[in-house]
Amino acid sequence: MEPAWAIGLMTGTVLDGNIDIAMIRTDGEKVDAFGPYKLAPYPPELPILLGRALEEAAKWRFQGQEPAIFREAEAALTQAQALAVCDFLRENGLSPGDIKAIGFHGQTVLHIAPKDGRRGHTRQLGDGPLMAKIVGADVVYDFRTADVEAGGQGAPLVPIYHRALLDRIGGGCETAMLNLGGVGNISWFDGDQMVAFDTGPANAPINDWVKRHGRGNFDTDGRIALSGTVDEARLSRLLDHPYLNAPYPKSLDRNSFTADMAEGLSLENGAATLTAFSAAAVGRALDLLPERPNRLLVCGGGRKNPALMAQLRRRANVQAMDVDQFGMRGDAIEAECFAFLAVRSIRGLPISFPQTTGVSKPMSGGRLAPASARNAA
């Protein structure tokens, strides 16, 4: 197909109160052009509602009926993101007919990886048909369920987009891409070989630790961590966690590693220790790769944390660089990814692979809420 404009939406597990909206022109194989990008705020009450949904999800764990709050949160989230897309289109002089599709990831409230022969489970809040009705464009949503039902991890899905980005700059096996969101995930390529998995915690436990102490939603510029001292004995114990040395493919839920890891430490020392752990976990991940890269291109919010980036260079023994230095948009990459995956889904191209999620064969994913069915209704 000819490259077409698509919009991607992403809200991470850090619950920072924002929606990432990004537009790219793509055929689902290459990125032809980058369009506008916007960080749109949620209504102030929505992060609170989503936080309650996450709490209920942690209790539920796919046992029995879904918590009633899911329906309320899903409708509120979908409406907020749909209205943000409408504003985005209007601000950029666009109409729904100008875009091929919207890639709507939704909000992950619970993700349980497969284990000991048991299939995993995943739940993202996001009503594709409702968004299609509000915006007036085709919507691709529910990207992870098909992979999980086929025995895969359901994550990470971003590697195929990371590959398209690295192809633009000629990155080889000595370069990998690292996303630092709520959790960390890495993508590494060597010719046709592709490896990707979740490295461990990234921003989520640090943010939760800071919130717990009433110091805001995150460690601004890493100042709290930089004013503290890493508890090396605690860090050593944390690095004994079996996940870190487990073979890939593997994936994590936001709550797989929590702020409780720093319990008993001061605010500053806890932040420093959690930051060091997130970085050291990346080092363990690099050791698992077929060939250890010497350069990491870092995207996601974590790249803006000087304490985390410094610990990455020290604890992971790697050159860690902001992807913005390479003409990419580090804040937009995950949203761009779901625009890319939406087009791949429409074309029936795979979005998950044996080397990334452990699914038995490359497979497509996502469900389509088409404009024709919506308009007919």
Curated annotation (Swiss-Prot):
Region entry Disordered: which residue ranges?
Answer: 358-377
Q: Provide a GO biological process annotation.
A: peptidoglycan turnover
Specify the pathway. Amino-sugar metabolism; 1,6-anhydro-N-acetylmuramate degradation; Cell wall biogenesis; peptidoglycan recycling
User: Is DNA repair a UniProt keyword of this protein?
Assistant: no
Q: Does the keyword Transferase apply?
A: yes
Leader sequence range is none
Query: Which Pfam families does this one have?
Result: AnmK
Query: What EC number(s) has UniProt assigned to this enzyme?
Result: 2.7.1.170
* Enzyme class at the top of the EC tree: transferase
Q: Which domain of life is it from?
A: Bacteria
What does the record give under GO molecular function?
Answer: ATP binding; kinase activity; phosphotransferase activity, alcohol group as acceptor
Question: Which residues are noted in the entry as ATP-binding?
Answer: G12, T13, V14, L15, D16, G17, N18, I19, D20
Q: Which reaction does it catalyse?
A: 1,6-anhydro-N-acetyl-beta-muramate + ATP + H2O = N-acetyl-D-muramate 6-phosphate + ADP + H(+)
- Keywords of this entry: ATP-binding, Carbohydrate metabolism, Kinase, Nucleotide-binding, Transferase
Sequence similarity: Belongs to the anhydro-N-acetylmuramic acid kinase family.
Function according to Swiss-Prot or TrEMBL: Catalyzes the specific phosphorylation of 1,6-anhydro-N-acetylmuramic acid (anhMurNAc) with the simultaneous cleavage of the 1,6-anhydro ring, generating MurNAc-6-P. Is required for the utilization of anhMurNAc either imported from the medium or derived from its own cell wall murein, and thus plays a role in cell wall recycling.
Designated name of the protein: Anhydro-N-acetylmuramic acid kinase
| Organism listed in the record | Chelativorans sp. (strain BNC1)
